[in-house]
Amino acid sequence: ETVADIFAGTGAVASAFFDKKLITNDIMYSNYICHVAWFKKEKFSEIKIKNIIMKYNNLSVTTDNYMSENFADTYFSLDDCRKIGYIREDIEKKYNNKEINSKERALLVTSLLYAMDKIANTCGHYDAYRKNGIYNKHLEMTFPEINVKCNNNNMCYNRDTNILINDIEADLVYIDPPYN
């Protein structure tokens, strides 16, 4: 009845058990936030999120921010870095002002992460970017594909697995630790 994926990564294994109660965990916050978007049961407004995404896609940002000051013309172009930085800050502002809930925040951050991945100037790994890269793609966010019929009791964690394992119970535990 309960499946725990305690090194859940991108959530591929957990998504195969959508008809069960899921417990996901990943120490990487970016993976955890995607798990919240895909697996956590919480009400959200799809129309609101799609409207925000459309607004973000039509943005033109000319002011610098953390992202542009630190990553311009490395993994992303200067323009995309400005846009990414603005969007990320705006998502947090909307969340802190209670304009969006935690599920909506997770949906927006997941959309941003996947849009960034599609245009990143890398060879598939983020340990280095391609020098003198050609930035011919631009940031385009889309609404994440989610299954709205997820179990009401699903739990998503961002904890050290060695500690978490003492606090959960499951009928099946999938363990695929990092091997890099």
What are these regions (language model features)?
Residues 1-9:
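Conserved class I S-adenosyl-L-methionine
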Residues 4, 23-25, 157:
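Hydrophobic/aromatic beta-strand patches that form the interior of the parallel beta-sheet core
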Residues 8, 29, 163, 179:
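Short, glycine/acidic-enriched loop or turn micro-motifs at the edges of active sites
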Residues 21-23, 28-148, 180:
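Class I S-adenosyl-L-methionine-dependent methyltransferase module
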Residues 48-49, 152-160:
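Conserved SAM-binding strand-loop segment of SAM-dependent methyltransferases
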Residues 163-169:
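Short conserved loop adjoining the S-adenosyl-L-methionine
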Residues 170-175:
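Short SAM/SAH-binding signature in class I
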